[in-house]
């Protein structure tokens, strides 16, 4: 069971995301319902360690067995999701991921994968051009240039809730 709480006032999500970089590019994704890019990852399951959750999500979404280098950020976000219009309070752990032992780069600059009923499109985005991309969370556009050695708590609020 995913750690999600739905109420009449909004939703709470407990998530993990992977920061996968190569040659000055960041791997981002979107699906057929989202006009914006976001990072690979997903919801943490009840009683699941965040480290296990990110590796599971990367296996599910990308079919890779990756390794965690280190945690980077814990971000608390408050926003209204643009497609569903739901109000969210989200806690997300971001991990720097090593995919050097995977054949991920052989898939090309842009590739798709099926995830149940959804088609996920993955794309390597040049980090120098992120400021012009429709990418969430927005703090990544700036902080990607200064990856912390130790986890940092960040807060991002995109809307008055």
Where are these regions (language model features)?
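Acidic, metal-coordinating catalytic segment for phosphate/diphosphate chemistry
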Residues: 1-17
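A generic structural micro-feature
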Residues: 8-12, 85-91, 114-119
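Short, well-ordered beta-strand micro-motif
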Residues: 20, 96-98, 123-126
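Conserved Nudix-box catalytic region and its N-terminal flanking loop in Nudix hydrolases
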Residues: 22-60
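Short, charged/polar surface micro-motifs in flexible loops or helix N-caps
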Residues: 24-26, 34, 45, 74-79, ...
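Nudix hydrolase/Nudix homology domain
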Residues: 35-37, 103-105, 110-161
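A short coil-to-beta-strand element that immediately follows conserved catalytic motifs
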Residues: 65-74
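Active-site-adjacent beta-strand/loop module that shapes the phosphate/pyrophosphate-binding cleft
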Residues: 79-107, 143
């Amino acid at each position: 069971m995913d750690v999600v709480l739905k109420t009449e006032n909004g939703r709470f999500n407990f998530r993990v995301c992977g920061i996968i970089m190569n040659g000055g590019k960041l791997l981002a994704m979107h699906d057929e319902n989202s006009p914006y890019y976001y990072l690979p990852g997903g919801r943490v399951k009840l009683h699941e360690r965040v480290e296990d959750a990110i590796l599971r999500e990367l296996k599910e979404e990308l079919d890779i067995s990756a390794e965690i280098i280190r945690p980077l950020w814990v971000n608390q976000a408050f926003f209204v999701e643009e497609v569903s219009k739901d109000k969210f309070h989200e806690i997300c752990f971001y991990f720097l991921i090593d995919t050097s032992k995977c054949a991920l780069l052989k898939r090309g600059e842009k590739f798709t994968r099926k995830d149940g009923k959804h088609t996920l499109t993955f794309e390597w985005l040049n980090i120098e051009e992120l400021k012009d991309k429709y990418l969430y969370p927005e703090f990544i556009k700036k902080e990607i240039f200064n990856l912390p050695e130790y986890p940092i708590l960040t807060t991002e609020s995109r809307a008055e809730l």
